[in-house]
Each structure stands twice: as C-alpha cells, then as structure tokens.
C-alpha cells in the first residue's frame, strides 16, 4: 500500500531491476526512491529482465532475424561507420601535416593508412631490387594514438547506441556487436589499402616497395578497442550487482586504470623536477623528438608492468626486478612503483571481501583472470617493434631489430599469479 520495495523472491532466469530516476514513466509524477509502484497511478517502477538471453536464443533455436534484432545490427553498423568516418576526417588533417613536414614519404601514405595506424595495426613491408629482397615488420604501439579512436567511438555511441543500452544484457550484446563490426571494417580496409610503389629515382635499380597492414592485427585490435570502449562507456553502477563476472571485470579495469594514472602523475612530477632518470633508461634522447606527454604515456605502461614484476625491454635493455642495470636513485623510483601496485591490488582484494564474502575464492580467481587479460591487452597495444632484413643496393642485407615493451604471454602469466596472491592477501586482511 505504501509503495515501498517488497521482498520479492528471485527466479533463476529473471531478475527485477529498478528503473532509473524516481519519476513515473506513465504519469511523470515523482515518487519516493525505492518505491516499487507509482503512488499516483499504480504503474510499475521496475522492469523484469531475462538473465539468460544467450541460453534462450540457443535452446529455442531462434531465427537469424531474432538474433540480429537482439544485436541491434542496424544501429551497430551505423555506429561503426560513424566512428570510422570521424577518424577519416581526422586522418585528412594528419595527412596534410605529413605532406608539409615529410613530403618525401607523403606520397605513399593515404588517410586509410593513418586510420589503421591510429588503431595500432601491424605493418608488413617488402622491398625488392634486381640484386636482392628484404622484409620488415613494424608495430608502433604508442598508446597516445588510441585517443582518437576512443573519442570517435564514444561520440558515435552517444549518438546511436546509448538509448539502446537498457540493461546489462543489451550493454554486453551491443559491446560485442560493435567490437565485431568495428574490427571487421578495419580488417576489410586493410585489404584495399595495400601500397605498391616504384620510386622514380630508384627505377634504374628495379626497386619495388610493397607494404600493407596485417589483416589479423586490425581485426583483433578493432574488436578489443571497440568492445572495451563501448562497454566502459555504457556500463552503469546499477549493473554492478547483477553479475559477478561483469562486476569484477570492471573492478580489474578500474584497478589498472587507477595504477596507470597514478604512475603517470608521479613520472610527470619527477620528469619536470629532474629528468635524469630518463637518460639512464635510454629515453632522454627522445625528448627532443617527441612531446613529453607522448613519452610518459608510453613509459607509464612499461613502469606499471614492471611494478607487477614483469620484465620490460626499453631500447633493447632488459629491466627486471633481478636485473635493473640502473643507478640507485632510479631503482628507488621503480621499486616505489612496486609498492604502489601492491597497495592498489591489496585494496582491490579488500573490496572483493566486502562485496563477495560467500564467494571469496571464486571472486579472487575471476579478478586475477580479468586482471591478467587486461594486462595482456595493455602489453599487446604498448609494445614497439621494428625488425626484419632490409635489402640495400650494395647487395648487403642489414638486419636490425628494435623492441620496447613486454612479452604478452609472460605478462599474462606473471600478472595472473601476482594479482591472485596480492588480492588474496588483501581479501584476508579485511576483517570487517
């Protein structure tokens, strides 16, 4: 009678969710927060959602049209197209800058290549002359490049998909659908953006250049970037208690994001006061070529990985907990980052204890797996490599290799063990 929230029994397949706000959708009158029914017209202030959409689709053998309807395929394609359209406009401006500053190479670069570079695709290059051939593989995993794809995805999601995210299931479906669509579009673009060139000043030597972005790298990167951006943008606090896996995945993302931001701030303060530590790790020379924000955004990823006991390579120098090869003051900086990561993950373990007292081991395991996956994605996006053999006219093959970053496999294994142990300790330390 009072309209207060009733103690309703839960069904395994359905759940009751409160609608956003306190105004009735029928009569638009305001109600008390927590009310189950409108006190003016009696309309429901909650909705019943099916928790087993995926199972019901499979078990009932629904038609393809039904599945496509659940995925909002039309809106998803519009959203993906708009995201790439925004990137295309940005790429024309970047192309103009390249033409002004690097006119000697601008003729082989078009806006489609810039779009793929912004999504951190792997570049495969081949060259041949009358006297030999060579190949090169390059991945410029500069995290700052992701800013434009993320912004374009957020804008397009706000325009087309935001209203379609009515509950947790729709958020997951739309995130997966957008990730697939965005990744496929990038991969298809890579097929049509292959470059074959015969420089006029080298035509007497029969020099031919061929390069393209790797199909698989853009497909995978596009899915991950599209899925995570859409998921994080669409996720709401009211979904946190609906699914332990989704809640803890968000917790793992937040843990790494907080760690990254804090490390970036600390490194920025240190660099502005005394940048000598950059010289010790071989990055000081880049300050003249790149903005300090670009360098620190990249270095932050590597330092956070080191703080998780993961060996990192900077300018082909291995830095690990056992072998730093740096002076004492810089060692203190790196070791303080380890202490910071310990504190952040301990707090995450305490929070898990607070929310999931009855499912402690399961919750910690889910957190460690989620944490390892996100750390693996960070390692996959942030590594920089240029390697291969380049055939020169003097008939010599010069082999060169540059690598900065970490191994994706070792990153996932070490971060899983590290996060599991530390979060479990934090879980046990929480006695409240």
Mark where each language-model region is.
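Transmembrane alpha-helical segments in integral membrane proteins
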Residues: 67-86, 134-166, 221-241, 329-357, ...
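Alpha-helical transmembrane segments and their helix-start/interface "positive-inside/aromatic belt" motifs
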Residues: 63-89, 166-180, 245-261, 357-369
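Intrinsically disordered, low-complexity cytosolic tails and juxtamembrane linkers
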Residues: 48-71
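Cys/His-rich metal-coordination motifs, chiefly Zn-binding "fingers/knuckles"
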Residues: 1-55
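Acidic, serine/threonine- and glycine-rich low-complexity intrinsically disordered segments
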Residues: 236-295
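Transmembrane alpha-helical segments of multi-pass membrane transport proteins and ion-pumping complexes
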Residues: 84, 88, 92, 96, ...
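Long, glycine/tryptophan/cysteine-rich extracytoplasmic
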Residues: 74-148, 192-213, 271-338, 379-414, ...
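Alpha-helical transmembrane segments of multi-pass integral membrane proteins
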Residues: 162-240, 272-283, 356-432
């Amino acid at each position: 009678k009072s309209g207060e929230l009733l103690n309703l029994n839960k069904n395994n397949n359905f759940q009751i969710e409160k609608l956003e706000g306190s105004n009735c959708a029928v009569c638009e009158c305001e109600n008390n927060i927590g009310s189950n029914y409108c006190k003016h017209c009696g309309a429901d202030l909650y909705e019943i959602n099916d928790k087993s959409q995926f199972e019901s689709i499979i078990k009932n053998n629904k038609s393809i049209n039904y599945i496509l309807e659940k995925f909002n395929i039309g809106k998803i394609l519009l959203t993906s197209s708009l995201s790439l359209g925004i990137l295309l406009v940005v790429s024309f401006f970047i192309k103009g800058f390249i033409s002004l500053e690097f006119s000697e190479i601008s003729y082989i670069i078009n806006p489609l290549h810039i779009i793929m570079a912004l999504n951190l695709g792997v570049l495969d290059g081949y060259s041949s002359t009358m006297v030999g051939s060579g190949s090169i593989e390059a991945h410029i995993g500069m995290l700052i490049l992701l800013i434009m794809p993320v912004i374009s995805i957020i804008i397009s999601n706000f325009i087309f998909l935001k209203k379609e995210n009515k509950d947790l299931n729709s958020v997951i479906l739309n995130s997966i659908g957008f990730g697939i669509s965005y990744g496929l579009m990038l991969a298809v673009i890579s097929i049509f953006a292959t470059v074959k060139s015969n420089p006029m000043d080298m035509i007497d030597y029969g020099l031919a250049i061929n390069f393209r972005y790797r199909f698989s790298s853009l497909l995978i990167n596009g899915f991950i970037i599209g899925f995570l951006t859409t998921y994080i943008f669409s996720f709401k606090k009211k979904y946190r208690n609906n699914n332990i896996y989704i809640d803890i995945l968000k917790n793992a993302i937040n843990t790494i994001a907080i760690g990254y931001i804090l490390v970036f701030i600390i490194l920025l303060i240190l660099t502005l006061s005394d940048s000598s530590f950059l010289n010790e790790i071989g990055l000081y020379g880049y300050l003249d070529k790149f903005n300090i924000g670009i360098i620190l955004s990249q270095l932050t990823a590597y330092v956070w990985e080191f703080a998780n006991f993961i060996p990192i390579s900077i300018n082909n120098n291995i830095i690990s907990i056992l072998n730093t090869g740096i002076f004492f003051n810089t060692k203190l900086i790196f070791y303080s980052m380890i202490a910071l990561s310990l504190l952040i993950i301990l707090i995450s373990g305490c929070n898990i204890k607070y929310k999931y007292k009855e499912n402690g081991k399961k919750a910690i395991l889910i957190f460690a797996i989620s944490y390892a996956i996100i750390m693996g994605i960070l390692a996959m996006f942030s590594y920089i490599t240029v390697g291969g053999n380049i055939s020169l006219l003097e008939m010599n093959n010069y082999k060169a290799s540059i690598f900065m970053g970490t191994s994706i496999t070792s990153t996932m294994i070490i971060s899983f063990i590290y996060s599991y142990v530390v979060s479990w300790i934090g879980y046990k330390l929480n006695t409240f």
